[in-house]
């Protein structure tokens, strides 16, 4: 079962990216490296509820 999630950068508070994940395969919070236009570099974005 796939669910839609929002990715947030904790330090800047940006919530830029929407993606989906399979809850059965990845029960933990997802962390992905994405580009932050505010900081102009790649940073870690974490799943928020």
Swiss-Prot record:
Matching InterPro entries, A to Z? Ribosomal_bL33, Ribosomal_bL33_CS, Ribosomal_bL33_sf, Ribosomal_zn-bd
Tell me yes or no: is Ribonucleoprotein among this UniProt entry's keywords.
yes
Listed A to Z, the keywords are: Ribonucleoprotein, Ribosomal protein
What cellular-component terms does GO give this entry?
Answer: cytoplasm; ribonucleoprotein complex; ribosome
The domain of life is Bacteria
What are the protein's GO molecular function terms? structural constituent of ribosome
Per the database entry, which stretches of residues form a coiled coil? Answer: none
Record-level GO BP terms? translation
**What would be one Pfam family of this protein?**
Ribosomal_L33
Q: Which family does it belong to?
A: Belongs to the bacterial ribosomal protein bL33 family.
Q: Which NCBIfam families match?
A: PRK00504.1 (NF001764), PRK00595.1 (NF001860), rpmG_bact (TIGR01023)
- UniProt protein name: Large ribosomal subunit protein bL33
Q: Give the organism the record lists.
A: Streptococcus gordonii (strain Challis / ATCC 35105 / BCRC 15272 / CH1 / DL1 / V288)
């Amino acid at each position: 079962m796939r669910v839609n999630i929002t990715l947030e950068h904790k330090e800047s508070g940006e919530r830029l990216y929407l993606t989906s994940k399979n809850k059965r395969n990845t029960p933990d919070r997802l962390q992905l490296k994405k580009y932050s236009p505010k900081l102009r570099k790649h940073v870690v974005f974490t799943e928020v509820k």
